[in-house]
């Protein structure tokens, strides 16, 4: 999450909403298939923070933690109250897949391009870069990408 403003953001006003899809790319337990994760803390102006699962093993540095259950085909929205502020993934009416039918967010490091400095209420693929995380070098690649891309705005 990036705070593009010149004032500190109160993250307790926000939450992450994940539309949950299973391995077979069908909605999990509709209509209760949206997971809402409340955020907390403050985010300084022009600062970024990484959200990770409480039990994450590859990335364990500080950041927001929670029960982020994400298998790569789930659209994620940053919500303030009832309003979508930012969106990652395709239309939440279907799983987020590549043209080959693979989960689009699986085993990749997704980050918004540094030239994009505003959120989008709809997913715009051209605003994002994805770098594959191969199983044999996931930790090293992830550490290098985080160092390279976060705090560079």
Regions found by a protein language model. Give the residues of each.
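Conserved beta-structured recognition patch
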Residues: 65-144
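Secretome/extracellular-domain signature
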Residues: 26, 31-96
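Solvent-exposed loop/turn segments at secondary-structure junctions
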Residues: 6, 23, 55-58, 117
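Structured segments of extracytoplasmic/periplasmic soluble domains
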Residues: 19, 52, 113-116
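Asparagine-centered strand-capping/turn motif at beta-strand->loop junctions
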Residues: 1-5
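Primarily marks secretory-pathway-exposed extracellular/lumenal segments that are disulfide-
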Residues: 142-153
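Acidic Ser/Thr/Pro-rich low-complexity disordered segments
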Residues: 22-34, 120-126
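Short acidic, flexible loop segments centered on an aromatic residue
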Residues: 6-26
